Regions:
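Cysteine-nucleophile active-site neighborhood
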Residues: 1-29
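Amide-donor transfer/coupling interface in amidating biosynthetic enzymes
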Residues: 25-151
Length: 151
C-alpha cells in the first residue's frame, strides 16, 4: 500500500499472531474475482503487527476483521492490478505455529502474550481451527488468482 500512496502503521487493535479470525468480505469484495466462491466470513493463517491506515487512491476495500479494517484491498498502480491481502491463504497453520514458536521470546517481550497460559490457549485455538479447516475455502484466493493470470 505504501508504494502506491497509502499509509501503514502499527496496528491499533492488536496483531494477528498465526491466525486472523472472522474476516468478513464486504459487498465490494463479493463482486471481486479474488473472492469468487469464498465463504463470506472465514478464518485464515496470518501474521502481522501493522495495519493499512490509509488506502491508496482508487483502492477498493474488499474485506476486514476486528483487528484490521483492511484485510483485503484492490487497486491499480501504473499498468498493474494489485490485490493486497493481510493474511496468508498460501500458508498452513502448521507454518504459523512454527513462526510463533520461533518468535515466542519476542512475543512475550512485546507483551503479545502476558503468560504461558495465554500463549498455550492461543496455540490451542489455532490447532482447533486447523481441525475445522476447509482447505478449498482457505486456498480459494490462490486458485482465483492463478485462474485470473492464466486468462
Amino acid at each position: 500500500s505504501t508504494a502506491a500512496g497509502g499509509k501503514v502503521n502499527p496496528g491499533k487493535n492488536g496483531a494477528h499472531i498465526g491466525i486472523a479470525s472472522d474476516i468478513i468480505i464486504n459487498n465490494e469484495g463479493e463482486k471481486h474475482f479474488i473472492y469468487k466462491d469464498k465463504k463470506k466470513i472465514f478464518t485464515s493463517p496470518a501474521f502481522n503487527f501493522d495495519e493499512v491506515s490509509e488506502l491508496p487512491k482508487n483502492a477498493i476495500l474488499l474485506s476486514s476483521d476486528k483487528v484490521n479494517n483492511v484485510m483485503g484491498v484492490s487497486f491499480n498502480a501504473g499498468n498493474s492490478k494489485i490485490i493486497g491481502l493481510q493474511y496468508h491463504p498460501d500458508y498452513e497453520y502448521s507454518q504459523m505455529l512454527k513462526l510463533i514458536d520461533g518468535r515466542k521470546e519476542r512475543l512475550f517481550k512485546s507483551k503479545n502474550f502476558l503468560n504461558e497460559e495465554e500463549y498455550e490457549s492461543h496455540i490451542s485455538y489455532i490447532k482447533s481451527q486447523n481441525e475445522l479447516l476447509d482447505f478449498n475455502n482457505r486456498t480459494c484466493e490462490v486458485r482465483n488468482w492463478i485462474n485470473y493470470i492464466r486468462n
